[in-house]
Curated annotation (Swiss-Prot):
Residues 763-811 are annotated as: Disordered. Residues 1-85, 541-811 are annotated as: Involved in transcriptional activation. It is found in: Cytoplasm; Nucleus; Membrane; Cell junction. Changing R460W: In ep461; interferes with neuroblast Q migration. It comes from Caenorhabditis elegans. Changing L482I: In mu349; suppresses ectopic expression of mab-5 and interferes with neuroblast Q migration. Keywords: Activator, Cell junction, Cytoplasm, Developmental protein, Membrane, Nucleus, Repeat, Transcription, Transcription regulation, Wnt signaling pathway. Belongs to the beta-catenin family. This is Beta-catenin/armadillo-related protein 1. Changing T498I: In ep485; interferes with neuroblast Q migration.
Length: 811
């Protein structure tokens, strides 16, 4: 295209220059001729339109309130929303002598491309002229070229501004012409239009690599208010720094030059809702993955300024970008965001019609939802209850996660949820999600599992910590099969949280009836709990965690639940039955599951405390008490724990209770026998016999009293003796090698002593340990078939079901 030195194309897209008007005239004439009308017809229509009283924004350049669609597609059109008549660039009037300097830039209709290429070096030289009027005019023409190149309607296939000397000359103008705002403004406008094309970005970044002082000169003018110079400086900086291919080095330079301190004040001072998103995004680029910049932004009150934008602005693009930036600081400065009322301000955005804004808001809220606050969250909780059943999977997931954090350890929020049908909504959502889970695969299934996990967590929090907790527990457990299904799926994350919820529920005695009666197929809660416990025990020495869930936590929760539910006699009978099945009674060296847990040195103290409490409850079952009474390893462990009353009083007290119960059981037998154990008499003779206690077995090599059939003479040499009285045939006089709890070597070593011969006997059913029958069946043959055809001693990990299914195989 030819350039006329007397024509000016302003920086603003909405301003038509004389050149563009001339082009419009030629276009109109061409169309009129081919459409069968005269050229003057088009001119007359334009004149009539100009003389009307209404204003479309074309004459006064006042942009409309609503942003145009093109503003989201073409960056240069952002200028139209930030201009006014006061910002018009005055056309410099040149003298004849000054005009002669532009004679080299000719106007040729036949070869416009040649003259454009030729004009660039000429204009580059004129921008270095000593006459400021000439420089001003040259910069305006260079800006016109840059603007036409970035316009998709008029751009050529190849960029014309490709010489780095143009960039260096523009840099010199920014440095040397500070006192001439018109020149600075056009220079920055030229920079901006060059950067609107990828070839221009590459040119500028290459020039910055050679001479990095381009960035400091741009930053210098971010604070220049006259003639809206700061707008073009900010837009140009944003274009350069946000380039993903070459902007990294420029970002480093901008951080070194403290650009964040120049940009942040405009969050409060700028009024244009079209420029503010650019400012917010520029701050995001500067702060991204850089702690030092984030600290500077926080010290300048940046997060508070962002919250003010959310509170008083309505432009969706601005709100979305602001929440995106706040999301960065929600992990960096969450307590201050909450203290400044961030959760209340963000809650107002959850009713917005933009899905991306709602999702970004929820993500920010999720990051700050775990911060304690005394401010009421009623509006936020109400909005979350509406969104938790959203069709958008991400929105409902974030909503459930936020609710889980808000109700944890917050009595007011729990009461609000219970008083506003929150429990009903959550249970319904959990039921629907469980039904949909089976049809999903891979990523969708993973997201649904996270959603279900959050729902269960929220319900678990609501089951305790407020006056209506009993009613909540009863309502949640109205459909116990919903939670039994979670246990049967054996997904580690869901297992942990479901077990945690069940632990709250079984604390209420009235709910033990549905717990006992609920079944899916032939599986009930007790059977599945013991199965999960066995699987976890087999994995205890193999791996510490499975998919982020600690194996120790699963063991602890199972032991805790078994401890609570064995208060019920019917459930106790069922627990004893499943604990005595071969796969559960032959763990390690041939011990039942609770004893196996006690043997493990890497199990935590609270788990061992629960295991001891479970054993105490099991001692109330006559058949199980006989089994435990014969276990020499258990007796030795209890004796060692009992001696540590100074360091571990709770464990010592539990061990003491079990030993006293054993002793009382032996005393009942002792009254009918001529012999008694002198060791037990000396150990527990001073204790009261009124409280159920337990006792250790004889370790002196004398005749064993209380367990099994009594013999008048020692039968240790009898080859048949072990088949009838297992406890007296075992060598129990070996010294225990660790008197201290949790000190090397471990207090509960995994003994290498072989299992009793009874367990190795292929005809084990004929031994003194008859196979028990659960309370709900009349005979063992009618009990669940899963245990009917098991090998005599398969070992702790020979079953394929002993391992949690991997996520890949599950989904």
């Amino acid at each position: 295209m030819d350039l006329d030195p007397n024509l000016v194309i302003n920086h603003d897209d909405t301003n038509l220059s004389e050149a563009s008007f001339t082009m419009e005239q030629h276009t109109s004439s061409y169309s009129d001729i081919h459409m069968g009308s005269t050229p003057c017809t088009g001119h007359r229509k334009v004149d009539m339109w100009r003389n009307h009283n209404f204003d479309s924004g074309f004459q006064t350049m006042n942009h409309s309130e609503a942003p145009s669609i093109i503003s989201s597609l073409h960056p240069s059109s952002h200028l139209s929303g930030m201009s006014s008549m006061a910002d018009y660039e005055p056309i410099p009037t040149l003298s004849d002598q000054q005009k002669q300097k532009f004679d080299g830039i000719t106007q040729n209709q036949a070869d416009g491309q040649y003259n454009t290429v030729r004009a660039i070096p000429e204009l580059t030289m004129l921008m270095k002229d000593q006459d400021n009027e000439v420089v001003h005019k040259a910069v305006i023409l260079m800006q016109n070229i840059a603007k036409m190149e970035c316009d998709p309607m008029r751009r050529q296939n190849e960029a014309r501004i490709v010489d780095p000397r143009v960039i260096f000359t523009l840099r010199d103008l920014l440095r040397d012409k500070v006192e001439f705002p018109n020149i600075i403004r056009c220079t920055l406008g030229t920079f901006f239009h060059i950067c609107n094309r990828q070839e221009g970005i590459d040119l500028v970044t290459r020039a910055i690599a050679e001479q990095p002082d381009i960035i400091p000169n741009l930053i210098r003018h971010i604070g220049t208010y006259p003639s809206s110079i700061y707008k073009y400086a900010i837009l140009t900086m944003h274009s350069i720094l946000s380039d993903k291919q070459r902007g990294g080095q420029s970002v480093i330079i901008a951080r070194q030059q403290d650009a964040i301190t120049h940009v942040t004040p405009w969050l409060e001072a700028e009024k244009s809702e079209k420029l503010l998103p650019v400012i917010v995004d520029l701050i995001r680029v500067l702060c991204e993955k850089n702690t030092e910049q984030k600290i500077k932004f926080v010290k300048m009150g940046g997060p508070q300024k962002l919250l003010m934008l959310l509170q008083h602005r309505v432009y969706e693009n601005l709100l979305w970008r602001t929440t995106q930036l706040l999301k960065t600081f929600s992990n960096f400065d969450a307590p201050n965001l909450v203290a400044f009322g961030g959760r209340q301000i963000l809650a107002n955005l959850l009713s917005h019609g933009s899905p991306r804004l709602v999702q970004s808001t929820l993500e920010t809220l999720r990051n700050i939802s775990d911060v304690p606050s005394k401010i009421k969250e009623d509006l936020l909780l109400k909005s979350l209850l509406e969104l938790v059943n959203s069709r958008n999977t991400t929105i409902r997931l974030y909503s459930a996660q936020i609710m889980s954090n808000l109700v944890a350890n917050n009595r007011h929020n729990k009461e609000f949820m219970c008083g506003n049908n929150g429990v009903v909504i959550l249970v319904r959502a959990l039921t629907i999600a469980t039904k949909e889970m089976g049809d999903l695969r891979d990523k969708e299934a993973q997201q649904m599992e996270d959603y279900i996990e959050s729902l269960i967590c929220t319900l678990r929090h609501l089951c305790v910590g407020h006056p209506m907790s009993d009613k909540v527990q009863a309502f949640v457990f109205r459909d116990p099969a919903l939670f039994l299904h979670k246990l049967l799926t054996m997904r580690p994350v869901l297992l942990k949280h479901t077990l945690s919820l069940l632990l709250k529920v079984v604390s209420q005695h009235a709910l033990l009836a549905p717990f006992r009666s609920c079944r899916i197929g032939d599986k009930g809660f007790v059977e599945q709990l013991i199965h999960i416990l066995r699987v976890a025990c087999t994995q205890l020495n193999v791996q510490e965690s499975i998919e982020g869930v600690r194996v120790k936590d699963i063991i602890h929760l199972c032991i805790q639940i078994l401890r609570w539910i064995t208060r019920d006699q019917d459930i106790l009978n069922e627990v004893v039955f499943f604990l005595q099945t071969p796969e559960n009674s032959r763990m390690g060296d041939g011990h039942t599951l609770p004893i196996f847990v006690l043997q493990k040195a890497n199990v935590e103290e609270n788990t061992k405390s629960s295991a001891l409490a479970l054993i105490y409850n099991l001692m109330h079952h006559e058949q199980m008490a006989n089994v435990l009474d014969r276990d020499d390893v258990l007796v030795k462990m209890l004796q060692n724990v009992q001696m540590q009353s100074q360091t571990h009083p709770e464990l010592a007290s539990l061990a003491n209770n079990i030993l006293k119960m054993m002793y009382e059981k032996r005393e009942k037998t002792r009254n009918t026998l001529p012999r008694y154990n002198s060791y037990l008499e000396s150990q527990f003779g001073h204790m009261s016999m009124t409280t159920p206690r337990s006792e250790a077995l004889n370790s002196s090599g004398e005749v064993c009293e209380g367990a099994g059939e009594q013999w008048s003479t020692p039968l240790t040499d009898d080859t048949m003796m072990d088949s009838y009285c297992n406890s007296s045939g075992r060598d129990s006089s070996k010294p225990y090698n660790s008197p201290m709890y949790h000190s090397p070597p471990a207090m509960y070593p995994e003994y290498s002593i072989g299992p009793p011969e009874t367990y190795l006997d292929p005809h084990a059913t004929a031994s003194c340990y008859p196979r028990p029958t659960p309370p709900q069946y009349n005979s063992y043959d009618r009990s669940p078939p899963v245990y009917n055809d098991l090998p005599s001693n398969p070992g702790p990990s020979s079953h394929s079901s002993d391992y949690y299914p991997s996520r890949n195989s599950r989904f």
